[in-house]
């Protein structure tokens, strides 16, 4: 098994809109297609993280509407699971009208699934006596179970062979292993990674049309509040893409770690830094491969959806490591960079996907570039301080322990606050 290829296949793909509500729509589409009749009633069971991430974010092709429920109900009516994470490009005014009618008639509603620690979506649909259901779990596109009228149509049981689970292997990899994987990325890998760069640059153009975080950040440069330099330029670029995604603009973005905003940071930061530093294209693309691997590695420990902000922390770790990698920094310097960024923004909370994510993206970009150049100059936070470990791997594992073990109540409190906002 080639871990890089597995990460690219499972975690790096085009997504239109915030990935959690899109995954809800995808799950609904599978259930509706299996039912084979117009859906008269639907119940959406979501893990707390998916509920949180889809509550306030705008949905593509809905004229600015928000939320998992509308996305999922639209997915029921589209019923084209073959569209995968671009399913909402098929949302039409007619579909939205029918979706809103189902919601208004109390025929479609959401429940937060209890005690689900990992990514989990279940959609149950009905038409008279006929029923169907779909479960997507562990990743945004992995169908784990499909049923119709009580009969299991499909079930994806986890393999008992550890070598079949790329995430387990990724979690056991060392930083040295990940560097070697990036070094040996082949032309197919690099071509796909370049496609992601181009896709995200195109999304940046769409974000430029909005008067949001990227716009106001650029205005501070025009007013000489901030200097025009590599760091500021990269922050503006990344903010524009996040602005576009969170505003529901119907433009695809290449994800990383199964997240579009993480793809913004993990891809565009090493791309722009490398380009401005006149690094050869092949090296830049390999550094982005390393960024994807690092992002995926962090999320093995912190969880797919976490109380911690993934687009800032996990993707920021990937970006910081990638910058050092493309500057031919050694293992020690990459370790210092990773320790620096985790020490800086390792406690940033996730309170769901929304326009404010662009602010966190900007903070991540700033921290990643600073952390990388400090590491390149042999400066970094050591294991004598806080939760920083002796190695980058240990630091990331400590962060994961804080996220999974130490912050369960934090996530519950955030979700409880957000539930009160649902009318």
Curated annotation (Swiss-Prot):
GO terms for molecular function: L-cysteine desulfhydrase activity. This is UPF0597 protein Emin_0811. PANTHER family: UPF0597 PROTEIN YHAM (PTHR30501:SF2). It comes from the Bacteria. It holds the Pfam family SDH_alpha. HAMAP family: UPF0597 (MF_01845). InterPro entries: Ser_deHydtase-like_asu, UPF0597. Belongs to the UPF0597 family. One of its GO terms (biological process) is L-cysteine catabolic process to pyruvate.
């Amino acid at each position: 098994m080639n871990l890089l290829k597995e990460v690219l296949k499972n975690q790096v793909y085009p997504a239109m809109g915030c990935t959690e509500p899109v995954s809800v729509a995808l799950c609904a589409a599978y259930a509706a297609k299996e039912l084979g009749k117009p859906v008269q009633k639907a119940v959406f069971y979501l893990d707390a993280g998916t509920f949180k991430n889809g509550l306030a974010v705008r949905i593509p092709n809905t004229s600015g509407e928000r939320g998992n429920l509308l996305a999922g109900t639209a997915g029921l009516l589209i019923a084209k699971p073959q569209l995968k994470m671009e399913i909402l490009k098929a949302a039409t005014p007619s579909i939205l009208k029918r979706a809103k009618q189902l919601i208004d008639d109390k025929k479609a509603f959401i429940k937060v699934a209890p005690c689900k620690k990992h990514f989990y979506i279940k959609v149950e649909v009905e038409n008279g006596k006929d029923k169907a259901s779909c479960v997507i779990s562990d990743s945004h596109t992995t169908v784990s179970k499909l049923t119709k009228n009580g009969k299991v149509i499909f079930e994806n049981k986890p393999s008992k062979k550890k070598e079949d689970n790329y995430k387990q292997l990724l979690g056991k990899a060392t930083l040295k292993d990940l560097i070697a994987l990036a070094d040996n990325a082949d032309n197919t890998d690099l071509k796909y990674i370049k496609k992601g760069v181009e896709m995200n640059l195109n999304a940046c153009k769409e974000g430029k049309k909005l008067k949001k975080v990227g716009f106001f950040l650029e205005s501070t440069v025009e007013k000489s509040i901030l200097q025009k330099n590599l760091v500021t330029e990269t922050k503006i670029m990344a903010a524009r893409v996040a602005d576009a995604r969170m505003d529901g603009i119907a433009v695809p973005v290449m994800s990383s770690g199964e997240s579009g905003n993480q793809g913004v940071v993990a891809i565009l930061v090493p791309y722009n830094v490398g380009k401005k530093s006149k690094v050869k294209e092949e090296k830049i693309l390999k550094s982005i491969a390393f960024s994807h691997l690092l992002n995926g590695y962090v999320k093995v420990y912190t969880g797919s959806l976490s109380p911690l902000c993934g687009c800032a922390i996990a993707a920021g770790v990937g970006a910081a490591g990638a910058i050092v990698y493309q500057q031919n920094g050694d293992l020690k310097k990459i370790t210092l960079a990773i320790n620096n960024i985790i020490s800086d923004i390792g406690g940033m909370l996730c309170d769901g996907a929304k326009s404010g994510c662009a602010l966190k993206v900007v903070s991540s970009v700033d921290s990643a570039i600073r952390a990388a150049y400090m590491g390149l100059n042999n400066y970094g936070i050591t294991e004598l301080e806080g939760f920083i470990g002796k190695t980058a791997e240990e630091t990331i594992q400590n962060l994961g322990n804080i996220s999974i073990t130490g912050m369960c109540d934090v996530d519950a409190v955030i979700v409880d606050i957000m539930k009160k906002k649902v009318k």
